[in-house]
Amino acid sequence: MSTAMNFGTKSFQPRPPDKGSFPLDHFGECKSFKEKFMRCLRDKNYENALCRNESKEYLMCRMQRQLMAPEPLEKLGFRDLMEGKPEAKDEC
Amino acid sequence: SSNPFQRAQEDEWRRRNKTVLTYVAAAAVGMLGASYAAVPLYRLYCQTTGLGGSAVAGHSSDQIENMVPVKDRVIKVTFNADVHASLQWNFRPQQTEIYVVPGETALAFYKAKNPTDKPVIGISTYNVVPFEAGQYFNKIQCFCFEEQRLNPQEEVDMPVFFYIDPEFAEDPRMVNVDLITLSYTFFEAKEGHKLPVPGYN
C-alpha cells in the first residue's frame, strides 16, 4: 500500500519523528513489558486509552536501560497518570 | 522653426513616457519581489491551513504535555508492513488495529526478523492513508528513516510512539475519517548508497 502510485494532485510528505528512532532492543530487555502491553490490548479490544499504564511502563523500561532518551513522563503525554495529580485538577 | 504649442506637446509626451516607464519598471520589480516572497508566503499559508500535507508549526514536547484528549472522537488505526523485494526480512505488525482519540499518545509494535545467516541493514519509510490525515499524525519516536541492523536470525520489537493532533477533531474535512492506516516499508540499505528522504507526488 505504501508503494502505491499516487496519480493526480494528492501528495504526501513523510516527516521524521520528533525524537528520532528508537534504538533496537537487541537483547529483548523490555520484551516482558511489551508482552504485558500486548496482552492488555487484546483484553481491552485494542482500546489504547485503557492500556496507557502498560505503555508508560514500557517506555520507562526503555529509559532505564538507555534504550530511549530520558524524558519527563508529562512530556510523553502521561500527565494524567502521574501520582498526586487527581483527575479533577487536570480538568480545571 | 517649431512653434510653442508643438514644443509644449512634445514635453507633455516626454513626461508621460517617463511616467509609463516608471510604472512598468515598478511592476517588474514588484513581480520579481513577489516571486521571491512566494516561497515563504506559501509555506506560511500551508502551515496555517495544512494544505498539501505540509508540516504544521507548533509541535513540540510542550504541546504534548498540555494536550487534552478528545475522548468522544475515536479513530481506528490499522497497521500495514511491507518489505522491498530484495530484503529478506520477516516484517509484520504485532497488532491489527488500535483505537485512539486525538490528543492522546499511543504505542504500537512491529516485529522484524532476519532469517538469513548474515547481518542485514534495513531502512524504512512510512505512509499514512488517507493523505489528508497525515498532517495530524505525529510520531514522537519510531524506527523509520534510520538504518536498523539485524544480526543473523535476530528478531526485535520495533515500537512506534505517536499521537493524533487534537486539531484533527476540529477539521471539517476530517469529519468522515474514522480509519487511518499506517504503512511501513523496509528497504535494504546498500553500502555507500545515500538514500534521500522519499516523497510521493
UniProtKB/Swiss-Prot annotation, chain A:
Q: Which PANTHER family does its entry note?
A: CYTOCHROME C OXIDASE ASSEMBLY PROTEIN COX19
- Its domain of life reads Eukaryota
Point out residues bearing the modification N-acetylserine: S2
Q: Enumerate the UniProt keywords alphabetically.
A: Acetylation, Cytoplasm, Disulfide bond, Mitochondrion
Q: Which SUPFAM superfamilies match?
A: Cysteine alpha-hairpin motif
Encoded by which gene?
Cox19
What assembly does the database describe for this protein? Interacts with CHCHD4/MIA40 forming transient intermolecular disulfide bridges.
Cited function: Required for the transduction of an SCO1-dependent redox signal from the mitochondrion to ATP7A to regulate cellular copper homeostasis. May be required for the assembly of mitochondrial cytochrome c oxidase.
Cellular compartment(s): Cytoplasm, Cytosol; Mitochondrion intermembrane space; Mitochondrion
Motif: Cx9C motif 1; annotated at 30-40
Every copy of the CHCH domain together lies at: 27-69
UniProt feature, compositional bias: Polar residues: 1-12
Principal cellular location given in the protein's record: cytoplasm
Spell out the GO cellular component terms annotated for this protein, sorted alphabetically and separated by semicolons. cytosol; mitochondrial intermembrane space; mitochondrion
Among the Pfam families in the record, one is: CHCH
Say which family it is in.
Belongs to the COX19 family.
Name the segments for region: Disordered: 1-20
Organism of this sequence: Mus musculus (Mouse)
Q: What is this protein called?
A: Cytochrome c oxidase assembly protein COX19
Disulfide bond sites: C30-C61, C40-C51
**Motif span (Cx9C motif 2)?**
51-61
Q: Which GO terms describe its biological process?
A: intracellular copper ion homeostasis
